[in-house]
């Protein structure tokens, strides 16, 4: 068992690519096989080393180590396609020598005209074979005109290419709908379908698991395997990932790259857990899986044919589950970049800053599903003025206009002014003393204090909120509570 993940380094590492890598990786680990990382960088105009580094870093962050390939090495390298061009030339020359491929001098304009003519007649566009039997005189004429040939594979007529897909079952294609297709471009670079076949064969790949969009490439690749007399690997084409509107996932659906989710403060184990469930249905009702549990549970026969829907709410639900296991210190580090982003954390932190920010993060632990969400809850600590929560102004004013509210707030303000130190335990004792002094309990004490200090009816632990606001800010807000009742 040998599988590969072979991304093109042409942009941010897409979440769909991460899922393809994961299914390959899980199968390799389940079957005690080999997982290869290969880089398909023949798109010279768009491929960058920066993108390649992002792919590698993302895989490592997700915990998907590879056994062979880029940086790791192996017996079947090089593992970048641009470093394998000499190998490709040898195979190309073999096909030319055996008459299984030929040079094509047709210009893009000529090909477009043929394609349009076929479409006008209601035919499926394919190459018309114009250059299949060119004589040497015509070739010389084309070369003199400055034409540079592509290389096309001869595809047999009236042949059926069929295979048993590991996900979709029996699939077949007719060769007459394929036509002789280009395998090497005019610049000498092999096209995707040709390079991938050579790489998979030379690297001993036995199982190819990839996105459904590659299904239409399979008959062309099978034609190349046949022309070279090579064994065809087993194919499995996994379902597309759609947004909640059932359209192909794109930027309009939110973050689409692994790096974006990392920067937003999602946990790698949560993202892996979520990606595994995008198109794979485990036995039973369990939805949370450790890496080892995923390896043990994974099987190709439980991959779905139908598109998988990327549900951000489900990802948040899963990430929230994993965040519960973080220590306060780990949660602080997860949220810190986002607290710096809103100016609540200085670039250089002293111990007092760290203690305050750690308490802040732990206070809102049950209110956030990912690190960046902390930004939605910290506004009440950033200014002197309290604003009543939008849409709830009337009920909030009603709390402050309760007959007992001024008594409670006055007692709390006086007690707070006497304190030398504010901690959650000290605040708890202070509120308890206010209850005793006013002979009031429960919401008649907690609610006016919370509304006066935060402008909200509900929220996290009030003792922590008071501690985080600090004495001076609390006194200022209590002294100006009258503005909220108008």
Where are these regions (language model features)?
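N-terminal Rossmann-like or analogous alpha/beta NTP/dinucleotide-binding catalytic cores
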Residues: 1-120, 217-230
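Glycine-rich phosphate/pyrophosphate-binding loops
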Residues: 29-41, 194-207, 231-242, 463, ...
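Conserved phosphate-binding loops in nucleotide/dinucleotide-binding enzymes
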Residues: 78-82, 184-185, 203-214, 242-274, ...
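Active-site cores that bind ATP or allylic diphosphates and position pyrophosphate for catalysis
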Residues: 94, 102-103, 107-237, 243-249, ...
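Small-residue-rich helix-loop
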Residues: 328, 332-438
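Charged substrate- and nucleic-acid-binding regions of tRNA-handling and nucleotidyl-transfer enzymes
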Residues: 424-485
């Amino acid at each position: 068992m040998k599988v590969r993940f072979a991304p093109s380094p042409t942009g941010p590492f897409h979440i769909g690519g991460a899922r393809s890598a994961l299914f390959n990786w899980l199968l390799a680990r389940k079957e005690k096989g080999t997982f290869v990382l290969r880089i398909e960088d023949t798109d010279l105009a768009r491929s960058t080393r920066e993108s390649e580094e992002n792919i590698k870093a993302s895989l490592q962050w997700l915990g998907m180590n590879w056994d062979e390939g880029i940086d790791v090495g192996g017996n079947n390298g090089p593992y970048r396609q641009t470093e394998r061009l000499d190998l490709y030339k040898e195979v190309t020359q073999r096909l030319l020598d055996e008459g299984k491929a030929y040079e094509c001098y047709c210009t893009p304009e000529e090909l477009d005209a043929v394609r349009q003519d076929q479409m006008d007649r209601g035919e499926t566009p394919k190459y018309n074979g114009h250059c299949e039997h060119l004589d040497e005189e015509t070739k010389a004429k084309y070369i003199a005109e400055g034409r540079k040939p592509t290389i096309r594979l001869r595809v047999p007529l009236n042949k059926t290419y069929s295979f048993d897909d590991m996900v979709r079952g029996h699939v077949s294609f007719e060769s007459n709908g394929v036509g002789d297709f280009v395998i090497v471009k005019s610049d000498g670079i092999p096209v995707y379908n040709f390079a991938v076949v050579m790489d998979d064969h030379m690297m001993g790949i036995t199982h190819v698991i990839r996105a459904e969009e590659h299904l239409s490439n399979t008959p062309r690749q099978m034609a190349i395997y046949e022309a070279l007399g090579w064994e065809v690997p087993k194919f499995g084409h996994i379902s597309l990932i759609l947004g909640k509107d059932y359209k192909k996932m794109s930027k309009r659906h939110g973050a689409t790259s692994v790096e974006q989710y990392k920067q937003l403060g999602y946990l790698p184990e949560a993202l892996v857990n979520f990606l595994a469930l995008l198109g794979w249905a485990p036995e039973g009702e369990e939805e949370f899986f450790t890496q080892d549990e995923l390896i043990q549970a994974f099987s190709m026969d439980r991959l779905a044919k139908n598109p998988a829907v990327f549900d951000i709410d489900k990802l948040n639900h899963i990430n929230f589950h994993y965040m519960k296991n973080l220590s306060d210190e780990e949660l602080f580090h997860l949220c810190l970049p986002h607290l710096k982003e809103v100016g609540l954390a200085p670039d250089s932190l002293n111990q007092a800053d760290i203690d305050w920010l750690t308490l802040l993060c732990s206070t809102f632990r049950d209110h956030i599903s990912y690190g960046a969400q902390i930004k939605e809850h910290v506004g009440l600590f950033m200014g002197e003025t309290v604003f009543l929560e939008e849409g709830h102004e009337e009920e909030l004013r009603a709390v402050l206009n309760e007959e007992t509210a001024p008594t409670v707030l006055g007692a709390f303000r006086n007690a707070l002014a006497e304190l030398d130190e504010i901690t959650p335990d000290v605040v708890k004792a202070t509120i308890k003393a206010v209850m005793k002094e006013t002979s009031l309990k429960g919401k008649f004490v907690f609610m006016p204090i919370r509304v006066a200090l935060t402008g909200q009816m509900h929220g996290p632990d009030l003792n922590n909120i008071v501690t985080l606001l600090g004495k001076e800010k609390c006194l200022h807000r209590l002294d100006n509570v009258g503005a909220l009742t108008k």
